[in-house]
Amino acid sequence: MDVYSAGSMQDSCIASVIDWLEFGSSFFRPLGDAHDIGLFGPASAGMPAVEATALFAFIHGLAAVQVPFTLEGKGLNRRHSAGLALQAFRYCLHTHVSHSRELPAELAWGGTGMSPKIADQLALAGEVLAELLTDADREECARLIEYEADANMLLPFHLEHLDHGYFRRRPPVPTGRFGTSYPESNAWRVSVLARALLAAPGHGHASRWEEALVMHLANVLSVPADAEDTTPVDGCLLHELHAGANLHPSFALEHHGFFHPGYVNRTLLSLFSTAYAYDDAGVERPSLLLRNVPELWDVQRRLLLWDGRLAYPAGNDYPRYCWGLLYLLPVLAFLQHEYSDGIAAWAEERLVDLLIREQRVNEDGSFCGGRLEQWRELIEDEGVAPPGRPAPSVYYRSQVDTPYYMALAWWWHNRNGQGVEVAPVDVDGALDRPFVERDCGLVFHRAPERFASWSWPGAAARGRSSCGVAGQPHQPLPGAGRAMRPPGPQPSRARLRWRLRNGGYAR
């Protein structure tokens, strides 16, 4: 199939990824004189450069081995993509602390709070590269995953684990609002522990991996009611595993100090990757793996705007159309195949269209190169000293994230046979309900043609109100409370008002 003959939404998606390959390859470089390994972006970006390189390996691995398109019409070829993918994959393996290769110490990564996420991304890259990997590659990847699983075995007394939280770093603050939680951290620990167990069930540490897996599973999408839940789990009761709630009672998720839909997507992404790992191994999924997923998705889907974007009632702390929004793409693919969710299909089509439209504005195949060009210039200007210079890791991740998550969504559709039948759904009617989470001072309502919200606190510790209209940009509003008036005949018009009471709760 020629890339220009793409017809379906999934075909358009992967064709867009192929259009990115030449631009993305311009950021890839060998590591010094070592021509067998290379990385995406500068080594000075630290461990985030490893993550960006793992994503790059997946993208080129897919292009080299899996996609049904001919690349030659784009001036590319599979052999070249295979070489880049293997160099990137091996860079991630060889810089890990479990590897014996002597490389500069500052490049080493592993055994930290975020490294299980990268281990899972490497495992996914290994899936698409499977036929190109050597026995040494497979052994080194298995050793890396075992190392990360060992690093996440239970510590005594539920102590905080390294640098990125452990179950919950601290109890809720006195107001009852959580502010900081770690569902996504526990979820990617679940992934690496599960992958280690599935690959080596007879390993000497398998029983401790299993113990840690169950504990982390119980504390991913945990809610306050779990503290008294007597559901039997792996020989004990759920409340005995409960280390603290990571979601509010109505399934709102806070992170970075405010309601953060992006981390819902990141959490679900790790859980869904784990679900497919169990399926591929022919092993039954743990009963806790998808616990509370439908309830959490019922909140998340009411944030879907008409062009595929997410609303962020409390604000956002990442670049527009980047990071948390992009995690949504493979999440939507999984939801369609697992739950036959028609709203997920509706949202995916619109989000892909939004991303491709921006790519077409750029002449170099990039997704966000145009609007982030000034950022790149500041990063590469040696005369600009931090904190004036943006973090290189965020810029380079932003460049590789979009094609990666589009490619991963395609891969997950492909493993399920591409086509998914979902019943027609009245999207606006299904999502037309107000949502209130008093625990975190949040109220929002997605009506058929309007979205309005109020959140206290918000990003940068500020209260935020916003309103969006179908077909128009979603904009913050000045002031506090607003009346929401969904359109329609006067007799059927609903109206909801709110104001702040009791130290910031929305009533």
Tell me what each language-model feature is.
Residues L124, E131, R143-L288, R301:
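Active-site lining segments of carbohydrate-active enzymes
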Residues A88-H164:
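Well-ordered mid-protein domain cores that form the structural environment of catalytic cofactors
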Residues G282-P286, W306-A311, Y321-R507:
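Extended polysaccharide-engagement surfaces of secreted carbohydrate-active enzymes
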Residues S8-S26, K74-R90, E210-A243, S287-W297, ...:
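An acidic intrinsically disordered interaction segment
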Residues R29-G46, R101-G113, K117-L124, D163-W188, ...:
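Carbohydrate-binding/catalytic loop surfaces
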Residues D2-G7, A54-N77, K117-D137, R189-A206, ...:
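Well-ordered alpha-helical scaffold segments within catalytic/enzyme domains
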Residues M1-E102, A227-E228:
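Low-complexity, Ser/Thr/Pro/Gly-enriched N-terminal "stalk/linker" regions
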Residues H260-F334:
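Long, repeat-rich segments with strong aromatic
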